[in-house]
Amino acid sequence: MSEQQELQPAFSIEKIYVKDISLEVPNAPQVFLEQAQPEIDMQLASAGQQLDDGFFEVTLTVTVTAKLPEKTMFLCEVAQAGIFQIRNIPGEDLDPILGVACPNILFPYARETVSSVVNRAGFPPVLLAPINFEALYMQQRAQQAEAGNA
């Protein structure tokens, strides 16, 4: 490889995998007799870490809880992770890649895993809406800036 090619910005997906998965159905089997529609709550968390020179792991954790007024139907948590090769990217551009681009890649995998696991537990599949990770990232940055000025 020429020196110029080695200095070109590079981004590639090395591996996508499920790092952790859990499902709890604390009120089975009675919960399967319920007729009411549950309230679905979804929480997201994303974290990135450098593994090696130019290699980063990003983990997107999706937690979905289905609740009835007085009991939990299920709690499903999926930690979908990926190893990404990111080279020759300026420092100020690295954070948005780890906080926006990588979660955008991981979310469809996490969404499918949640739906499949919930369905295998005997519930209708949960269809999670797409997430605007750029808007979430900008919101977090604004909150951090506000907290820094307080």
From Swiss-Prot:
InterPro entries in UniProt: SecB, SecB-like_sf
Subcellular location: Cytoplasm
UniProt-listed GO biological process terms: protein folding; protein tetramerization; protein transport
Keyword Protein transport part of the UniProt annotation: yes
Gene Ontology molecular function terms on file: unfolded protein binding
Keywords for this protein: Chaperone, Cytoplasm, Protein transport, Translocation, Transport
Chief localization: cytoplasm
GO cellular component, one term: cytoplasm
NCBIfam families membership: PRK05751.1-3, PRK05751.1-4, PRK05751.1-5, secB
Family to which the UniProt record says this protein belongs: Belongs to the SecB family.
Subunit comment: Homotetramer, a dimer of dimers. One homotetramer interacts with 1 SecA dimer.
Known function: One of the proteins required for the normal export of preproteins out of the cell cytoplasm. It is a molecular chaperone that binds to a subset of precursor proteins, maintaining them in a translocation-competent state. It also specifically binds to its receptor SecA.
Name of this protein: Protein-export protein SecB
Species in which this protein is naturally found: Chromobacterium violaceum (strain ATCC 12472 / DSM 30191 / JCM 1249 / CCUG 213 / NBRC 12614 / NCIMB 9131 / NCTC 9757 / MK)
Lineage: Bacteria, Pseudomonadati, Pseudomonadota, Betaproteobacteria, Neisseriales
The gene coding this protein: secB
